[in-house]
Amino acid sequence: MRHMQSATRATLVCGSGVKQIIAKGHPNTRVFGARKARIPEREVLAAKPKITRITHLNLQPQERQAFYRLLENELIQEFLSMDSCLKISDKYLIAMVLAYFKRAGLYTGEYTTMNFFVALYLANDMEEDEEDYKYEIFPWALGDSWREFFPQFLRLRDNFWAKMNYRAVVSRRCCDEVMAKDPTHWAWLRDRPIHHSGALRGYLRNEDDFFPRGPGLTPASCALCHKASVCDSGGVAHDNSSPEQEIFHYTNREWSQELLILPPELLLDPESTYDIHIFQEPLVGLEPDGAALEWHHL
């Protein structure tokens, strides 16, 4: 009797051990005849295709009209005219401002110049690679004491961002939807020139162009826009005979003397180091025997 009880107890122990191994899913254990239970509800859910939810702003006419009235504000008009290159206020950035107003749930009475500059600054934060240009917004929004108050401005930006539930990404399709409501409005005709697309290399930057100017000062002259306007008008920027001479003549006058402009056909290896030597003009063009003179190092 005692032997039978011990045998039964051993069987129970062995049986419980097997259950534990199965429960743990031992990799070498395979149970024959076991099938996974089918759940019809899961099969139906898996068969349904994924539907991408498209969100619409659903801008009301009164909201669009209030925004257009805001754009006619004298300060904003002067600011937009200052941005002649459309680096910080092209049509897509302005469309993002209106989208931000809608997402933040602003009433039309809250369509103010300060909220405009805050939203425009946030739009530049999200979309623009060149971060220095957006600092021009500070003196327009804060006045002459912008150096003292710009930390508060950045807090306003963060609060505005939080009011939108941090949904600051606006797709191009959404911007096109905003502009399609009133496609002939002048704000949606502010196309950025192609020569101002993309980022600018550090050695091509003029540090004076990044310092905020603010109201009352003329915008910095842009050599690229000037040359493009001359070409668009059918004129000739310079009467040099060769394109290379035209490039050098133009850039030497417009850019800093510390900037070296190379011909477009000259390719340099960015991993290599080059020594630059500046030469003077030769004293005489040719030797009596026709051999060319060497240039003199400075």
Curated annotation (Swiss-Prot):
Region (Speedy/Ringo box): 61-193
GO cellular component terms listed in the entry, alphabetical order: nucleus
Alphabetized UniProt keyword annotations: Cell cycle, Developmental protein, Meiosis, mRNA processing, Nucleus
Cell cycle in keyword set: yes
Protein name: Speedy protein 1-B
Compartments, as annotated in UniProt: Nucleus
PANTHER family: SEEDY PROTEIN A/C FAMILY MEMBER, SPEEDY PROTEIN C
GO molecular function: cyclin binding; protein kinase binding
Annotated domain remarks: The C-terminus is required for CDK2-activation, but not CDK2-binding.
Superkingdom as given in the UniProt entry: Eukaryota
Organism: Xenopus laevis
Family indicated by similarity: Belongs to the Speedy/Ringo family.
One of the protein's GO biological processes: G2/MI transition of meiotic cell cycle
UniProt gene name: spdya-b
Main localization category: nucleus
